[in-house]
Each structure stands twice: as C-alpha cells, then as structure tokens.
Design a protein with these regions (language model features):
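Active-site neighborhoods and metal-handling regions in enzymes and metal-associated proteins
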Residues: 1-278
C-alpha cells in the first residue's frame, strides 16, 4: 500500500543464508502467502509516531531484539547489516544491539538492475498499459477540450483512472500543464481551463502495472490551427535530440560514452533544460 511509503509499518530481512522474514500488518499475515520466498511473517516494525506515540523507542528495541535473534541463527558471527530505508529509532536500536549499519540502498538498487525474463515481460506489460492509459487521456482531451470548460485537473484525472483500470497503483507527481503554464516546466496541474489551439504537456510519473514506474512525457497540440513556427522548430529540435540519443543506446554502451556523444541542445534551450541527459 502507498500508505506504507510514508508510514512504514512493513519491513523485510534477508539473511545471508536466504532466510527471508517480513514484518507486516499484525492481523494480516496472509498477505504474503503467495510468495514462496517468505519463510516467516511477523508484526511490530511500525516504528513511527502515529502508531507508537511516545513509545517508539521501546518498540524499536523489541524489533532490534528480533533481528538479533534471527541473525544469530541464520548468519552466526556476522554483524554487518545493510539497511536501505531505516527509521531513526530503528537505526539507533540496531546500532546499540551491536550491528554495523551499512548502506543498503546501493545493494538493493544493484540487485534490481539484474532483470529476469519474467521481470522483462512485466516491464513490457507495464509500458503497454501506460501507453494505453495515455491514449485514453489523449482521446478525452481532443474530444472534450474543444467543447470548453475542461480543466487541467479534468484531463489529469483521466490518466489516474486509466492507470488504475489496468492494475496500476498511483502517480508520483501532478506534472500536467497547458498553454502559458507549460513554460517554465515543473508547475503542477490545476483548475485552469484549457483553451483550443493550445499546447498540453505532461509527464506520467506513474507507478503502474506490477508496481513498475513508467515515466513518459508527451506534448500535444489541441486544436485545428497550426502551432506557431517557433513551436514547430522547438519540436523538431527536440525530436532530433531524442533520436540522436536513442541511436547511442545499445548493449555495452557506457555512461561516459553516452555523455561524450550525446546531442547538444541549441543555446536558446540551455537555460531551462531538464536535469538529466536523457
């Protein structure tokens, strides 16, 4: 659940021998029954103030005690513990229990970098679902906006609905703007009514099917008039930028090679260019 992302009650311990323990909802151990990798289901990792109040430290010590017992059995003699997203009281309690806390996010990110065939198929499915959701939003925008009275929020709501319809989960941002609000970029969508013959731009930033993030950007011209010449020129330059950079993406390509050979935007597009290369 998204709620766990900002009120973390769930934790997973992966021991050196492969033994995996999950701390979950106290009365819902069945949530992990489908996963053969989970050997134990426990409760008690809800180490945040909303749940524990002034006794978070007591709960953290109890949690650290469970971790100590588990590792004594499944990783005897080992005291290094990599944690990716530690709650503060948990960090203190585990350190006090004698563990050497190390960076766990690097470990998990590098593990995610290796994709098995099922994960590749899941990614393709998620991308297809995202593209279908965008198509639904585009159909609504092109049909409804010319009638008038359609806001940025109205269009953005369609992407949410189409994502959920296909098994998606949530959307991280609200990056959809229209007309003059598209520049500078990074404003959130709002109640502005979108006019005809205006630009509509968005970035999906959605967590879609199988919990996979699909981050796609699109810019649409809504209306029957031709866009201004400077808009057409900017679009053509952006298309060239994408196509040149795509040609460099191939197995074995290194980051330094991509950095050295990437397409360079013209000077007038440098000031507000995006924060990443591609």
């Amino acid at each position: 659940q998204l709620w766990n992302a900002h009120n973390p009650f769930r934790a997973v311990l992966l021991c050196a021998d492969g033994h995996m323990v999950i701390w979950d909802y106290k009365n819902a151990p069945f949530l992990s029954c489908f996963n053969p990798l989970v050997r134990e289901v426990r409760a008690g990792a809800d180490l945040f103030y909303f749940d524990r109040g002034d006794k978070v430290d007591d709960a953290a010590r109890a949690f650290a005690g469970e971790v100590s017992s588990l590792l004594a059995e499944h990783a005897p003699g080992l005291t290094r513990l990599a944690i990716d997203k530690p709650m503060l009281h948990a960090h203190w309690a585990l350190a006090a229990a004698g563990f050497t806390i190390t960076e766990g996010e690097e470990v998990t990110e590098k593990a995610r970098a290796v994709k098995c065939p099922d994960e590749i198929r899941a990614m393709r499915c998620a991308v297809h679902a995202c593209e279908a959701a965008m198509a639904g939003m585009e159909a609504y925008a092109r049909t409804a906006i010319p009638r008038g009275g359609v806001t940025e929020n109205d269009v953005w709501a369609v992407l949410h609905a189409e994502n959920i319809r296909r098994g998606g989960e949530w959307i991280e941002t609200r990056l959809l703007t229209s007309g003059p609000r598209t520049n500078p970029w990074f404003q959130e969508c709002g109640p502005r009514e979108i006019g005809t013959n205006e630009i509509l731009a968005f970035d999906t930033d959605l967590i879609g099917t199988y919990g996979i993030c699909c981050d796609m950007s699109r810019t649409w011209w809504i209306g029957t008039d031709r866009p201004r010449p400077d808009m057409v020129d900017a679009m053509r330059h952006a298309h060239e930028h994408i196509m040149v950079n795509m040609e460099m993406l191939k197995p074995g390509a290194t980051v330094p090679e991509l950095s050295a050979g990437c397409h360079v935007l013209r000077p007038e597009f440098q000031k507000q260019k995006y924060g990443c290369l591609m």
